[in-house]
Amino acid sequence: MNAMQPPQSIEEIKAGLETTEKGGVRQSIRNCLTVFQRDPLLSGAIAYNILTDRKDIIKPIGFHRESTALNDTDMKYLLLYLEETYGLTNEKKIDNAIGIVANENKYHPIRDYLSDLVWDGTERIRFCLRHFLGADADDYTYEALKLFLLGAISRAFQPGCKFEIMLCLVGGQGAGKSTFFRLLAVRDEWFSDDLRKLDDDNVYRKLQGHWIIEMSEMMATANAKSIEEIKSFLSRQKEVYKIPYETHPADRPRQCVFGGTSNALDFLPLDRSGNRRFIPVMVYPEQAEVHILEDEAASRAYIGQMWAEAMEIYKSGRFKLAFSPAMQRYLKEHQRDFMPEDTKAGMIQAYLDKYTGSMVCSKQLYKEALNHAFDEPKQWEIREINEIMNQCISSWRYFPNPRMFSEYGRQKGWERENPATDSGNPSEKTMDGFVEVTEQMELPF
């Protein structure tokens, strides 16, 4: 079947329609399909929009319309046209024919937009967040925005691809953070900030047809429990949803990415294992080169060329939808600026900075570093100390085989990676900690 056959005149189409034994036009899907494929008004008019998962009318068909999406009013006009022009009146057959012709005439508006872009060669991704929001123009900010753009492009061309990163813009109210995400979506209908509940059965309807989705309210009220819910939500690659008029639920691969905005600096709950899905960028609107709405047309043109630059990277194939290991390490440290102060980690670090021994255990840290001299640690407190030592403290290496501690018995623990020595040169120490005496050394007795 070919939905884009050359249009014919109405008389030619009528002459080619199947008829009944009595000579009337047959009420068949085939006849309805022939009309939609060849009628001069309807040929090429109906298409399936992959982004919205809906049927669209993509060219004028003789009556005023407010949007491209096929709606009930459009159906009434189409039924009237087919009845008056061809004598076709079976609504179910007409609707089935519309479904077939739309499926054979698919399009994706974001793919079409991105594919038509031509980059002028000027680098903008590196400087965009400084230009509009006053963020630092460093490698981290560049890599953060580039990763987000490539994730959005990948989701458009490869729906459901794995991308669980949220770019989070952090700064005072009125900085233009939400406006940035809205303009980044290119068209306002491709943007949404209406996602309020992640456990809603109809969450797919909130994502449907959108490319850039801002989570502002959820990030503003985030706590440890809700952050875990957001993490789980970001990790999903599809929704399983049954559209009301369909018989069976179907997988709906995600075609969108998520951005976060927060006015509060410490918007991330304390998570010593890392919040790798959240990439925070601090913005300083007073340092911005322009306000993003000062000249909206110019801002949109700038962003359009930034998408063109990102498309060059995407088409080259030389990218990954993840930070490099070095940038991951930087991110983990950087995220601590956006968490509440970790007082227990600070107390343990202060204790270790003054401690002269070469190994410690969790029980020792509980009693001596956290000042619980007369208490016994609970299991969850031991786990917390282990997490701090393994995630937050550097220069100490975990040993899994228990060793003897004079006050705490045999315990697993941590040892200094570079133990302090009495002589300035660690290589001069023997295994037992004594200095080897050579023939040239004079004994002091």
Task: Place the predicted regions along the sequence by residue.
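N-terminal nucleic-acid engagement/recognition segments and initiation subdomains in replication
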Residues: 1-124, 139, 143, 375-376, ...
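P-loop NTPase catalytic core of nucleic-acid-dependent motor ATPases
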Residues: 98-208
